[in-house]
Amino acid sequence: MKKIIAAAAIAAFAQSAAAEEFDLNINSDAVRGALSGPLSRVFSGVTGQYDAGLIYKKGENDSPDPKDTDLTLGHFGVLATGDVGAKGAEAGAGLGVRAVFADRGSATGAALALGGQFELRMPGFERLGLSGYGYFAPGILSFSDLKSYSEYALDVEFEVVRAAAIYAGYRRVNVKPEPNGPSNADDGAHLGLRLSF
């Protein structure tokens, strides 16, 4: 399953080589890569934004804690995006759906998650930004070994040049393979880089 998820993510990335934004972040045991851009680059004539990404977390094989198992999580989502109309601030948001494919230890599954994202920049401090996203799939929208899924993150970024920003943030991923099992699959701070094309 890990090979299938990785191949699907690479194929999505390759087809969208002209994406508007490439995002990569790391922490001590996980890496997340994502591409996002106008949905019309994937499906001609369609408005909105696409978002494709992959998280890989290396588990600790000798740990008795179930949350320390390997995690491979891929997603592809679509969002309706726009300006939120905040006076005196540059603020945008999006709402949409995300198809998620997860492989955690011996459990594999999929989910259809609902959620959204936001980005905020204040006038006079345009180089500083606050952004975040959150997605949730309850049991009714989770399939195979996956009983529920949620993922959220919050980042503070500094725009080094117009096409590149660095950021620090926090992300939590909950992938629940059993009704009463552990759900926390990735949790912690990260450092990242965003490149716009």
Indicate residue ranges for each PLM-predicted region.
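Context-gated lysine
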Residues: 2-3, 57-58, 67, 87, ...
